[in-house]
Amino acid sequence: LYSVIAHDLRSPMGSIKMVLNMLILNLPAEKIGDEMYELLTMANQTTEDVFSLLDNLLKWTKSQIGKLNVVYQDIDVVEVVDGVIDIFNMVAGLKKITIREEKPEKLAVSADIDMLKTVVRNLISNAIKFSNENSEVLVKLEEKDGTAVVSVQDHGCGIDEEGQKKLLHTDTHFSTFGTNNEEGSGLGLLLCQDFVVKNGGKLWFTSKKGEGSIFSFSLPLKK
């Protein structure tokens, strides 16, 4: 049922998202005024959040009922992360957030590229959501102990100890709000953990309330 609802709602929401993205790109505040631009930005952010939630819900449900299989292929993690960052630069710019990247020339793994993109998208989206304005999100890629490690660090609200205990557990509900009151359901992180484990890796995090969080995952390097 969840997958049917998410699928039926995702397409029209995607169309609305595309229109709002085009309006923001072509209608700067100087043209329509600060108040109207702020309303447009809020509508765009809300639509992005709803679309992301529907997309995560659809993938999570399919994964749980065994309808998502891992399709292994040779992937350069650096190339995948670069592509996701390009997509999120505009979203980050709306909060005056800079995405900085530290990376080697190449990190080769054998994994499902769609699942990998979903994980990176969710982690970067969350980092932007929970970062303060005029701050930086650091995306670090490195080779460590035979694995490719990707870490996404924000300088935002962080998670308290009680919240950390609930995160990444399907039997506990954890939701919170971003620095601009963007809603977070916790579903995206559960999906990230599921996809990383399915590809033979692991996901972990460190966080401190009021200072920010670092979410990391590893995948075995291509042999």
State where each predicted segment sits:
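Conserved catalytic submotifs in the C-terminal HATPase_c
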Residues: 71-76, 93, 98-107
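A conserved beta-strand-to-alpha-helix junction within the catalytic ATP-binding
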Residues: 71-86, 117
